[in-house]
């Protein structure tokens, strides 16, 4: 059973896409708002019936119902509003994530957790501490979205399909994340050789500011991109795909970093993170990466200790 905690725009988008991909025959929606997950589940069941899908959606306000879940997606948290930085969300969302983490530990101690709550990397750390799970089973969703955005903007410049690009984005999911054009390839040729310096600068800027741009345009943050990315990650777990993708995980010596979650390439399968892939970086790229690590460290250091137990 797949459980999605949080029945807002991202959670419901993920639920719909996962159902269309037939990743499980039961998808549980959890939310603290009475009636919300039940109503969403009923609507999705009608969709499932119309499309002939063998997928049952169930809505609940009780954490005890997550028992038996092998994969839990956490999208709960305060939304990012126009002009708000991810850092401003820290304290309020740390409390929410810590509470959810304790419930997961109680009712689904063998599950794999993927979360989207911002600021993402710091919340991944909070979830890791709150559950007490191995780092392989607590994964921050961000990199699939960031990499997808990089591929989209680069493909527009090149006039090719985004599917032709293997993108790499590293560091913090936020203002200090950095796409790596020298390690992002089109059939073995790096983007840094296919695009001019000015084009690369534009692609990187568009990628970094994409989330804020969506919020600015429509007044609320992205949901379809994250929903699709979550479904891709869920597929890797449920089908043991051993898929290479970008995600935020707690590093344990990789890149010379310990006990800090940041976006890096991983191999994802049924057991969670199978392997963290270490990309060879130039000195300049290494400096940018470490700047991101330091930014995450500062956020983690500002989380109240009571949320890390």
UniProtKB/Swiss-Prot annotation:
User: Which SUPFAM superfamilies does the entry link to?
Assistant: LDH C-terminal domain-like, NAD(P)-binding Rossmann-fold domains
**Residues annotated as catalytic:** 173 (proton acceptor)
Residues reported in the UniProt entry to bind NAD(+): 6-11, 31, 93, 116-118
Q: Where does substrate bind?
A: 80, 86, 118, 149
Q: Answer whether the UniProt record assigns the keyword NAD to this protein.
A: yes
Tell me the domain of life: Archaea
Enzyme Commission code(s) on record: 1.1.1.37
* Reactions that this protein is recorded to catalyse: (S)-malate + NAD(+) = oxaloacetate + NADH + H(+)
Any one GO molecular function term: L-malate dehydrogenase (NAD+) activity
Q: What GO terms fall under cellular component here? A: cytoplasm
Keyword annotations from UniProtKB, A to Z: NAD, Oxidoreductase, Tricarboxylic acid cycle
GO terms for biological process?
carboxylic acid metabolic process; tricarboxylic acid cycle
Question: A Pfam family name for this chain?
Answer: Ldh_1_C
Q: Which family does it belong to?
A: Belongs to the LDH/MDH superfamily.
Described by its record, this protein's role is as follows: Catalyzes the reversible oxidation of malate to oxaloacetate.
- Tell me the protein's name: Malate dehydrogenase
Gene responsible for this protein: mdh
